[in-house]
């Protein structure tokens, strides 16, 4: 009888422990989800605020902030400094693992991708920009095929084409320009260039991780550092460094908005790394799809972007396909299978681009 009591006590203890572990897991997941949603929703709102809403001068007149390169510089400096602080706190070495020219190649494509993203907002609205970035799966797959020799299955290409179709429905059936511009074709070209450069960034970074034993913070420091140098060089070359600083100093709110933009991007990177480490890229991908959908809804409410019914259908087609892809990838993972589809998920998942947080 005594032994029976001991067994019951043991099973009760195990049950309580399992409940505590599950509660801890759920709390961590909730914090990770809240961190990603909060940081990147704030980032999206501030990004649109900086690029498409005018700022007031001291005399009451209004001007637009036009220096996308300066925003890239601000974000990269903040991210590099944050990574340096973390590395020093962990007692790790700041020495570069890969040759410097490897980081420069990633930084250059990363800079071009981010610059194109900011510039595009001058010509197309935020929902268009966000949905356009969801359509980068096909370019990433093509770049991965030609650069890394990856192979993808018919299902991978079907998913990519469905997402691309949803994007085209969105682009062709309603207004996609911002309130101040009618030159949407230039904005679409910039978004295409963004996807091209971002695809190269993801592929180059993946090759670096495979070729060298390095931490994500090593890439953060040196890629962001190189990107900062590139940004300063371009600002000096086109004579925009000091005018950008002057604009920030003479217009209320620009400094605060740009600082918060950089802080939310840096925080977003940290939460991304934590989420992938604790829960995996598939959970992160699902969170990011939800975040992108919510950001479009918020943008339409805050900045009054009119979307047609067919545009909403196109958006739902894109996000529905992305959710389906996450479920399929999860089944493959738990089934112990790995093929081209998981590679597609890896290269198109925002988390794998550790420096381009502008998702």
UniProtKB/Swiss-Prot annotation:
Principal location listed in the UniProt entry: Golgi
Region (Disordered) location: 332-359
Reaction(s) this enzyme catalyzes, per UniProt: 3'-phosphoadenylyl sulfate(in) + adenosine 3',5'-bisphosphate(out) = 3'-phosphoadenylyl sulfate(out) + adenosine 3',5'-bisphosphate(in)
Gene Ontology cellular component list: endoplasmic reticulum membrane; Golgi membrane
Bias (Low complexity): 340-359
Pfam families reported in the protein's UniProt record: UAA
Membrane topology: Multi-pass membrane protein
Localization per Swiss-Prot or TrEMBL: Golgi apparatus membrane
Transmembrane segments: 26-46, 68-88, 157-177, 184-204, 228-248, 254-276, 300-320
Gene Ontology molecular functions: 3'-phosphoadenosine 5'-phosphosulfate transmembrane transporter activity; antiporter activity
Keywords: Antiport, Golgi apparatus, Membrane, Transmembrane, Transmembrane helix, Transport
Entry's Gene Ontology BP terms: 3'-phosphoadenosine 5'-phosphosulfate transport; transmembrane transport
Role, per record: Probably functions as a 3'-phosphoadenylyl sulfate:adenosine 3',5'-bisphosphate antiporter at the Golgi membranes. Mediates the transport from the cytosol into the lumen of the Golgi of 3'-phosphoadenylyl sulfate/adenosine 3'-phospho 5'-phosphosulfate (PAPS), a universal sulfuryl donor for sulfation events that take place in that compartment.
Family indicated by similarity: Belongs to the nucleotide-sugar transporter family. SLC35B subfamily.
Protein name in UniProt: Adenosine 3'-phospho 5'-phosphosulfate transporter 1
Organism: Dictyostelium discoideum
């Amino acid at each position: 009888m005594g032994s029976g009591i001991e067994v019951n006590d043991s099973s009760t203890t195990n049950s309580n422990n399992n409940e505590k572990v599950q509660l801890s897991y759920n709390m961590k997941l909730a914090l990770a989800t809240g961190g990603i949603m909060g940081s990147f929703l704030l980032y999206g709102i501030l990004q649109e605020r900086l690029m498409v809403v005018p700022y007031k001068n001291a005399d009451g007149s209004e001007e637009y902030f036009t220096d996308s390169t300066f925003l890239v510089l601000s974000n990269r400096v903040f991210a590099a400094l944050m990574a340096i602080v973390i590395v020093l706190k962990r007692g790790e070495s700041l020495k570069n693992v890969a040759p410097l020219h490897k980081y420069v190649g990633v930084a250059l494509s990363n800079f071009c991708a981010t610059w194109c993203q900011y510039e595009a907002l001058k010509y197309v609205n935020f929902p268009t920009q966000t949905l356009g970035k969801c359509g980068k799966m096909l370019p990433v797959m093509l770049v991965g095929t030609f650069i890394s020799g990856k192979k993808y299955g018919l299902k991978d290409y079907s998913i990519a084409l469905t997402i691309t179709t949803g994007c085209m429905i969105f682009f062709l059936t309603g207004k996609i320009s911002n309130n101040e511009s009618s030159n949407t074709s230039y904005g679409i070209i910039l978004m295409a260039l963004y996807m091209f450069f971002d695809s190269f960034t993801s592929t180059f970074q993946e090759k670096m991780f495979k070729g060298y034993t390095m931490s994500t913070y090593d890439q953060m420091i040196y890629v962001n550092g190189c990107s900062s140098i590139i940004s300063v060089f371009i600002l000096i070359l086109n004579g925009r460094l000091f005018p950008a600083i002057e604009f920030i100093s003479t217009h209320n709110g620009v400094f605060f908005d740009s600082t918060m933009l950089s802080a939310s991007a840096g925080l977003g990177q940290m939460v991304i790394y934590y989420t992938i480490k604790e829960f995996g890229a598939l959970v992160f991908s699902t969170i990011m799809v939800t975040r992108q959908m919510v950001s479009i809804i918020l943008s339409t409410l805050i900045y009054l972007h009119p979307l047609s019914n067919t545009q909403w259908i196109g958006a739902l087609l894109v996000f529905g396909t992305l959710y389906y892809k996450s479920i399929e990838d999860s089944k493959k993972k738990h089934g112990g299978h790995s093929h081209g589809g998981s590679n597609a998920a890896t290269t198109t998942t925002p988390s794998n681009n550790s420096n381009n947080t502008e998702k």
